[in-house]
Every structure is written in C-alpha cells, then in structure tokens.
Amino acid sequence: MNSIDPRAIIDPSAKLADGVEVGPWSIVGPDVEIGEGTVIGPHVVLKGPTRIGKHNRIFQFSSIGEDTPDLKYKGEPTRLVIGDHNVIREGVTIHRGTVQDRAETTVGDHNLIMAYAHIGHDSVIGNHCILVNNTALAGHVHVGDWAILSGYTLVHQYCHIGAHAFSGMGTAIGKDVPAFVTVFGSPAEARSMNFEGMRRRGFSDEVIHVLRRCYKIVYRQGLTVEDALKELAEPATQHPEVELFRQSILSSARGITR
C-alpha cells in the first residue's frame, strides 16, 4: 500500500509501485514512474519522463527530472533514469538528457548524492558513488563505480571520472581522472591513488602494490602518456585492476589530469 500525503500533487498518468511514500507538497508530474519502496520527502518536484527504481529515498526540496538549461534544448522528449537504493539528499538537482547526446541522464544503484549537488544533462553516474555537498557536474559527465567527489567539487562538461577515483574538497576538474587516481586543487592535479578506498573495499596488498608502481609509471617518471601506456601493457595482462586503470587513460578524449 502506498502512503500519499493528501497535500501532495500526483499526476493521473504517474505510475507508483507498491510501498511508495510521497510527502506533503511534493509534485509528481506526468510520465514519472516510481519503483517499489521509494520514499519521496516533502517539497520534492519530479518531472517526466523520469524512471525511479526501488527503495530510493529523496529528501526535501530536490528537483528531479527538470528540463536541461542547455540552450540547444528545444523541448525534445528526453529522460532521466535512476536505479535502486539511492539516497538523494536535500536540494539536489538532476536534469534530463538532450538529443545531442544520449537523450538520457542515468544514475545507477547504491549512490549517495548529498545536499545541493547537481547532476547535469546526459551525465552517467555508476554504482556506489558518493557526491558530497555542493558537488556540481556539468553536462555529459561520466562518473565510474565507487568514485567519491568531495564537497564543492566542480566537473567540466564531457569529463570522465574513473572508477574508485577521489577528489578533494573544492577541486575543479577540467580533464579526465583515471580510475583509482586522487586529485586535488583548482585546477585539479593528480596527487596519488585512492589506496585507503581500495583497502576498505578489500583490494589485496599485492594489487595495491602493483597499482602504486603503475601510478609512478604514469605520473612520476616523466614519460609521455603514450610511452606510459606501453609500460602498463604487460602488468595489465596479469591484473584486471591495472587494465581498468590503463583503459581509463587510453579512452580519454579530453586528456588526463596530471
């Protein structure tokens, strides 16, 4: 059974699964689907086309699925898809996509999106990510699984943040951040790898040691990116984590943060 506060406004075309809660003064617009067990707090605005999965919690004053402010957007049908078990805290804004890209903004599963964070149009957020308060992602940004972006991190459009990467507070990211890399500063500079995060997630000492050596190859030996990638080729055949690091560099379109 759903629990809908009588002061909420639910469009007749919205689809709410069993166990959904909607708080007072929230608005659920046309073409919005909400999965089982999701809790919508007070004063939340959901605009479609938006699909929200199961067992999410969205806190007050969040705006989810609004039109993009991209000046090229002319009202074309685009959407937002949010997975399961996400926590979206107070005042978060997430925009739908544009037809110039994927026409979809995507948020995966088990993410924590903290107060006043912004996810721009056509962005893709993986699983188990943390976006700390006031983090702002421009359009077309990709964030890999388990990445952590500390408070007030700013990410330029089209940047890719690799899996397990970490940014310090107030970091301004203008280039891609490879998997596992820790960046700080404005503009961002690579400082190390997220070894503490690896330990917490059960990475073996051997893998951490190998990744440490690979980081030094890319960032401490004065090699070009092309030459560093050649040096990573052999260890990448033995360790999938190194291959993940290598591929995140190889696939970079904007160049990597160094």
Curated annotation (Swiss-Prot):
Pathway: Glycolipid biosynthesis; lipid IV(A) biosynthesis; lipid IV(A) from (3R)-3-hydroxytetradecanoyl-[acyl-carrier-protein] and UDP-N-acetyl-alpha-D-glucosamine: step 1/6
Main location: cytoplasm
GO molecular function: acyl-[acyl-carrier-protein]-UDP-N-acetylglucosamine O-acyltransferase activity
Catalytic activity: a (3R)-hydroxyacyl-[ACP] + UDP-N-acetyl-alpha-D-glucosamine = a UDP-3-O-[(3R)-3-hydroxyacyl]-N-acetyl-alpha-D-glucosamine + holo-[ACP]
Signal peptide bounds: none
Pfam families: Acetyltransf_11, Hexapep
InterPro entries according to UniProt: Acetyltransf_C, Acetyltransf_C_sf, Hexapep, Hexapep_transf_CS, Lipid_A_LpxA, Trimer_LpxA-like_sf
Gene3D superfamilies reported in the protein's UniProt record: Hexapeptide repeat proteins, Udp N-acetylglucosamine O-acyltransferase, C-terminal domain
Domain of life: Bacteria
EC number: 2.3.1.129
One annotated GO biological process: lipid A biosynthetic process
One cellular component term from this protein's GO annotations in UniProt: cytoplasm
Subcellular location: Cytoplasm
Swiss-Prot/TrEMBL keywords: Acyltransferase, Cytoplasm, Lipid A biosynthesis, Lipid biosynthesis, Lipid metabolism, Repeat, Transferase
Coiled-coil segments: none
Family: Belongs to the transferase hexapeptide repeat family. LpxA subfamily.
Subunit structure of this chain's protein: Homotrimer.
Function text: Involved in the biosynthesis of lipid A, a phosphorylated glycolipid that anchors the lipopolysaccharide to the outer membrane of the cell.
Name listed for the protein in its UniProt record: Acyl-[acyl-carrier-protein]--UDP-N-acetylglucosamine O-acyltransferase
Originating species: Pseudomonas putida (strain ATCC 47054 / DSM 6125 / CFBP 8728 / NCIMB 11950 / KT2440)
Name of the gene encoding the protein in the UniProt record: lpxA
